[in-house]
């Protein structure tokens, strides 16, 4: 069973975990990160012991539930229990946002840029990166990724894996990297 936790810069809605019925899969979560009206920088990585995901931001993060928490009162950082996290989603708003996921993160990641010049960098798993309005830079890295530039002059780099890159309106630069890739202006 999958549940979602919303981690935002201003508003939070979290679903408390429900016990799994006998014979069902253990409960997992999708961690949802929502940007605010200003430029932001979000970074997500897995600790070397593989037990914890760390999320940090230049803005305060609020969270509820018992999967993610602030370490030692640092409200700009969250730690999440890795076995209970199935995916990450980041939705930017206004401003020039930067969202980076390190190559230690192998679960699905979905990032959506808003208006502005956004830089979205995926992890080692299957990523879906959507640039939005403005000149965006999308980097898929490892995994079979989908990169959609949106409006503006975008730069899309697939990396390793079988990637799909679509530039959208504007003068776009597309580089699939290694693998069997599909590129479309």
Predicted features and spans:
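Secretory targeting and sorting signals
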Residues: 1-23
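Intrinsic low-complexity/IDR segments
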Residues: 18, 182-185
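Intrinsically disordered, low-complexity cationic segments
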Residues: 21, 156-159
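Extracellular lectin-like interaction modules
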Residues: 22-105, 118
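Glycine-centered beta-turn/loop sites at beta-strand termini
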Residues: 35, 91-92, 101, 111-113, ...
């Amino acid at each position: 069973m999958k549940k979602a936790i919303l981690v935002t810069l201003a508003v939070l809605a979290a679903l408390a975990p429900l016990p799994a019925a006998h014979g069902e899969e253990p409960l997992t979560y999708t961690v949802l990160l929502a940007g605010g009206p200003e430029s932001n920088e979000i970074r997500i990585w897995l600790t070397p012991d593989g037990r914890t995901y760390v999320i940090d931001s230049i803005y305060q993060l609020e969270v509820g539930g018992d999967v993610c928490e602030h370490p030692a009162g640092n409200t700009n950082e969250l730690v999440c229990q890795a076995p209970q996290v199935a995916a990450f989603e980041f939705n930017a708003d206004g401003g020039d946002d930067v969202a980076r996921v390190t190559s230690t993160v192998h679960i699905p990641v979905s990032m959506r840029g808003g208006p502005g010049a956004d830089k979205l960098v995926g992890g080692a798993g299957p990523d879906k990166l959507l640039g939005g309005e403005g000149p965006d830079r999308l980097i898929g890295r490892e995994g079979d990724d989908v990169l959609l530039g949106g409006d503006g002059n975008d730069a899309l780099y697939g990396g390793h894996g079988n990637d799909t890159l679509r530039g959208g309106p504007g003068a776009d630069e597309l580089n699939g990297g290694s693998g069997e890739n599909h590129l479309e202006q």
